[in-house]
Structures are given as structure tokens and as C-alpha cells.
Curated annotation (Swiss-Prot), chain B:
Protein name: Dynein assembly factor with WD repeat domains 1
SMART domains associated with the record: WD40
GO biological process, one term: intraciliary transport
Gene (UniProt): daw1
InterPro entries per UniProt: G-protein_beta_WD-40_rep, WD40/YVTN_repeat-like_dom_sf, WD40_repeat_CS, WD40_repeat_dom_sf, WD40_rpt
Source species: Xenopus tropicalis (Western clawed frog)
Family in the record: Belongs to the WD repeat WDR69 family.
């Protein structure tokens, strides 16, 4: 990758490129999701101390996906990456009910950010492969998603591990970025 | 005019004359860029004496001694093996760039954690944390050779000037409308030039803290800039595929180097300011005559984007680093490829010579840095240990210490 490639990905993307920001609490499954998108091996994933960037092709778009570490001490640095974001993907560990409040708060703060205003948001209710996972409808309700009125949004249940639901979510992304980019 | 004393400059080799003119103390340099251990010393002395009125017959013996000393220094062989001296768990997020001061006594690291840290090279102790930027600290420099100031350029669109000794911020330069991604002090340390994703470069007055000039004309992001040795020219490399040559301090654009068919990744002057080397995503590197702005050579061979280019300190060699995982060394005069550096298992994003010119250091996405013999292309050592890709690397002036900055949030000192 190198610093120069990072600068190139920093530019506001040309029409057929989409800049996607992948955020969420630590252990939500962002990096697994990123690797699933890029069809890479997901067996050895460690907590992200910084960021990962991958480009994937989907429906005629080049999706430049930025996966940013979610540990509490580095969350204040999420805003380093807000500039030129086309779509925000927010990942939630659906089985970690103890942290629903925390993740809801972080999401609410993101939606308040001026630099992300109007940016379409896809919420992945991840880890649906676990028996204890809350269904997407329950999470949507718990997080008061229906109160979001300043942008298009969608919640999609998925398992980054098995890949189920991931493509449906990305289809939504492509459809909605399309509207915004035109 | 009266000669007061001689100063010796090892790299690039030269003799500095300190003299008095009209009551004022002045200096001038005699560059000996082509000096080698086998050069005929008497011939060199004779030439200097012919060209330089300050060197009178009574001084020739002294000059000869100085040249012999330079030859001895140039001829020194160094087969040193580097070992990992320290891992600095410097930052809580990935590093960007690293840089030494001239003497190598301290160095700086920039990071995604919005800070720049100042380190003592000998002990690996942290001396200062420069805090205040609101986004990634990307471009960092000491005002070498003085080394008493540090400039930082950030994604927060500002540049800050700091005291290297106390860590105090002197000025915050505001005016760019996008990320600052490259910067340089002029050699006199009176100006800072910054290059930005907003397609402009700006010059800032260090004393007053005011903007001195805006250099507009590029059609895309500026990602590389550098001054020439005397400080009367600045070059800017852009994603618009061109390099501009600006006259300083007027800010007049005197040449636009047009010819590359891809984004520029780096642009550098050689020591005597006669040549400019440019690296491009079009897989080539070009050499340009800096006086007339004409392309004099296209250095080909790489199979993927050229990500960095550098001259050795005398300007005789050009080294290129590429996304194809190889580096190449070319002769600046014959433009022939002298060596191909093969071994990295990922793209090479940074390349530098030591001041002596007998070692090349490369940084790669394969998590290693490697040391090479520029003349044979032989890999002398693989510096292993980083757990993620290496973004930046540097030699100190002595050539006996290396620092590497990585995406793994650490900086490593090797010596």
C-alpha cells in the first residue's frame, strides 16, 4: 500500500469509485467483514491497531473500504477518516447485548458529525451465526433507528464469518451511493 | 578579500572557504563531487588554485592535506551489520514519516495519532510530544543543517512550526484548504514550503509566521516538493502528471516539466542543481535539465509504478523504488541501469542512500527494510521485525543508524 497509495485513496473519489468507511466497536467484526468482501482468509484476525484499506469491485463500482480500529482509546481518531466519505457502514455484534447501549451511543455521535451529514448509513447486524444474536428488528428498535430522518439508512442482518447477508448489504450500498453520486 | 579558514564537508565532498570581504564574514563552497580515493591530488589542487583566487600559492599545501583527508574518508570501507537496538512503541496509531536532524542526535516521527514525537537517537528516549494538530501528522522535517526547529504538516490543513529544543509551538500556518502532505525548509531556514491536496503550494515566513506566497498552477494534488541546494528554486510534483519549477522568492513559475503519462510520485534535485529526477506512476523515471526544463532521459525497466526516486549525495547515482518490488540504480551521467535490487516480496515505497553513497536502504510493504550495495545490487541485510508494512526509513548522516516507521505503530532503531 505505502503512504502514497493512501494519499491517492484520500482524494475525493471519481464517479465510479466509492469511499466507504467501516466503523463500529472493537470486536464487532469489521476486519472480518472487510476480508470477506475481498474474499480473503478470515481465520487469523487480530484486533486492528490502526486501519486496513481494501478495494473491491462491485456492480461497476470500485469500492475503497476503510476499516478503522474500534477500541475505545482509538475511537476519538475515527474523525481522521471522515473526509470525502460516500457511505458509512456501521457494524454491530448482535450477540453482545451488554454493549448495545455503548454502540448506540457511538452511532448517534457519528450521525451528528458535520462531515458525515447526509451520508447514507448501512448498519450490519453482524454475527447472526451465533444462537444468542439479537434479530435486526430488535436492534433497530433498541437503537431508535426509525428516528434517523436526515439520510437514507438500512439495517441488514449478516454473518461476516459465513458471508450470509453481506452481499445484500453491499447491493444496498451500491444502489444508494448511485443516487447520491448522480 | 581575505581567507580566514577552511571548513571540511565530507558528504558530498567539498571544502568551504570562510573569508572576509568588506568587514563581513562570508563563505563559499568548492564542491569536489567527483573526488575518489584514486584521484590525482596535485591535479585537483592545481585546478582549484586556477579557479579560486582565495587559494594562493601559500595555501596549496593546506588544501592538499584537506583533500587527502576527504579521500581517506571517502575510501573508508564499512561492512557494518545492523542490529535492532530499540523498538519504540511510539504511537497508538500507525506512523507516517520519520526524519533525522543533521547530526543524527535526534529524530522525529509523525503519526495518525495526530502527534509528532521527538526522540534522542542514542538512548531511544522520548524528548517531546508535539501536540496540537487535529488530524494525522503526515509531513515532518527538521530545519537542517541547523536542527533547532521542526515543521509538521497535517491532514488538518495546517502546518506548525516548533522549537526542537523545548517542543514549544511558534506558529500555526493556516490557509490551505485541504490536507498538507509535503513540506520543506529552504536551506537558509527562513522559509517553509508546504504542498497540499488543494493543488497549491505555499511559502511561509518563519520569522513573522505569515504566508509569503501561494504557488498556483497545478491542476491536481501536490504530493512532493523540494528546494535546490542554494534555495532559489523549488520543485513541486503533482498528480496532474507534471512537475513545476518555481523561482524563489519571486514565486514565478519558470518551467513545467511535461512528459510523464501518470501521476508524479516524487521529484528531486541533484546536489549541484543541474538535474531534476522525477518518478511517476507511468512506470518510468525521467531526468530533466533544470536550466531549460527539457527532458534529457527516461529511465525505464520497472514493470509497475515508480513510487520514489532519490539521488546520492554527490548526484552521480539515481535510485528508484517501484510497486513491482524491485529497486534500480542508474548512472546520472550515462543514464544506464547499473544495478537491479531484487528480493523484496512486496512493493517498495521508500528508497534512500546513506550520505556516503555506498549503501541503499529500502522500505517495503513486505514488513522488511533492506540494505543494498548500490554498485553490485547485492542485498547486504534484511531488517526484520516490524509486524506490518513499513512506510518510511532514514539513515543518519554518519550512516551508522537507521530508523524505520511502520503501520504497526512502532518505530525501530537499528545500529
Amino acid at each position: 500500500m505505502g503512504l502514497l497509495s493512501i494519499l491517492r485513496k484520500l482524494k475525493s473519489a471519481p464517479d465510479q469509485e466509492v469511499r466507504i468507511l467501516l466503523l463500529g466497536l472493537d470486536n464487532a467484526g469489521k476486519t472480518t467483514l472487510l476480508k470477506q468482501l475481498a474474499s480473503e482468509d478470515i481465520s487469523h484476525i487480530t484486533p486492528t491497531q490502526g486501519f486496513n484499506i481494501k478495494s473491491v469491485q462491485s456492480q461497476g463500482f470500485k469500492l475503497n473500504v476503510w476499516d478503522i480500529g474500534g477500541q475505545r482509546k482509538i475511537r476519538p481518531y475515527w474523525r481522521n477518516y471522515f473526509e470525502n466519505t460516500d457511505v458509512l457502514i456501521y457494524v454491530i455484534d448482535s450477540a453482545d447485548r451488554k454493549r448495545f447501549e455503548e454502540t448506540g451511543q457511538e452511532l448517534a455521535e457519528l450521525l451528528d458529525e458535520e462531515k458525515l451529514s447526509g451520508v447514507p448509513v448501512l448498519i450490519f447486524a453482524n454475527k447472526q451465526d451465533l444462537l444468542t444474536a439479537a434479530p435486526a428488528s430488535e436492534i433497530a428498535e433498541g437503537l431508535n433507528l426509525h428516528t434517523i430522518r436526515d439520510r437514507v439508512w438500512q439495517i441488514q442482518s449478516c454473518s461476516a464469518l459465513t458471508g450470509e447477508g453481506v452481499q445484500d448489504g453491499m447491493n444496498w450500498v451500491c444502489k444508494n451511493v448511485n443516487a447520491k453520486k448522480k | 578579500m581575505r581567507l580566514k579558514r577552511f571548513l571540511l564537508r565530507y558528504f558530498p565532498p567539498g571544502i568551504i572557504l570562510e573569508y572576509e570581504k568588506g568587514g563581513e564574514l562570508k563563505t563559499k563552497a568548492i564542491d569536489l563531487l567527483e573526488l575518489s580515493p584514486t584521484t590525482d591530488v596535485d591535479l585537483v589542487v592545481e585546478e582549484i588554485q586556477k579557479a579560486e583566487p582565495l587559494i594562493t600559492a601559500s595555501r596549496t599545501q593546506q588544501v592538499k592535506q584537506l583533500i587527502l583527508r576527504l579521500q581517506e574518508k571517502i575510501g573508508q570501507q564499512d561492512s557494518r551489520q545492523f542490529y535492532l537496538f530499540k523498538v519504540l512503541r511510539a504511537h497508538i496509531l500507525p506512523l507516517t514519516n520519520v526524519a533525522f536532524n543533521k547530526s543524527g542526535s535526534s529524530f522525529i516521527t509523525g503519526s495518525y495519532d495526530r502527534t509528532c514525537k521527538v526522540w534522542d537517537t542514542a538512548s531511544g528516549e522520548e524528548l517531546h510530544t508535539l501536540e496540537g494538530h487535529r488530524n494525522v501528522v503526515y509531513a515532518i522535517q527538521f530545519n537542517n543543517p541547523y536542527g533547532d526547529k521542526i515543521a509538521t504538516g497535517s491532514f488538518d490543513k495546517t502546518c506548525k512550526l516548533w522549537s526542537a529544543e523545548t517542543g514549544k509551538c511558534y506558529h500555526t500556518f493556516r490557509g490551505h484548504t485541504a490536507e498538507i502532505v509535503c513540506l520543506a525548509f529552504n536551506p537558509q531556514s527562513t522559509l517553509i514550503a508546504t504542498g497540499s491536496m488543494d493543488t497549491t503550494a505555499k511559502l511561509w515566513d518563519i520569522q513573522s509566521g505569515e504566508e509569503a506566497l501561494t504557488l498556483s498552477g497545478h491542476a491536481a494534488e501536490i504530493i512532493s516538493l523540494s528546494f535546490n541546494t542554494t534555495g532559489d528554486r523549488l520543485i513541486t510534483g503533482s498528480f496532474d502528471h507534471t512537475v513545476s519549477v518555481w523561482e524563489i522568492p519571486s514565486g514565478r513559475r519558470i518551467h513545467t516539466l511535461i512528459g510523464h503519462r501518470g501521476e508524479i510520485s516524487s521529484a528531486q534535485f541533484n546536489w549541484d542543481c543541474s538535474l531534476i529526477a522525477t518518478a511517476s506512476m507511468d512506470k518510468s523515471c525521467k531526468l530533466w535539465d533544470s536550466l531549460n526544463g527539457k527532458c534529457v532521459a527516461t529511465l525505464t525497466g520497472h514493470e509497475d509504478e515508480v513510487l520514489d526516486v532519490t539521488f546520492d549525495s554527490t548526484g552521480q547515482l539515481v535510485a528508484t523504488a517501484s510497486a513491482d518490488g524491485t529497486a534500480r540504480v542508474y548512472s546520472a551521467s550515462s543514464r544506464k541501469c547499473l544495478a537491479k535490487l531484487e528480493g523484496h516480496e512486496g512493493e517498495i515505497s521508500k528508497i534512500c542512500f546513506n550520505a556516503q553513497g555506498n549503501r541503499i536502504l529500502t522500505a517495503s510493504s513486505d514488513k522488511t527494510s533492506r540494505l543494498w550495495n548500490p554498485h553490485t545490487g547485492e542485498c547486504l541485510q534484511v531488517l526484520k521485525g516490524h509486524t506490518d508494512e513499513i512506510f518510511s526509513c532514514a539513515f543518519n548522516y554518519e550512516g551508522n543508524t537507521i530508523i524505520t516507521g511502520s503501520k504497526d505503530n512502532t518505530c525501530r532503531i537499528w545500529r
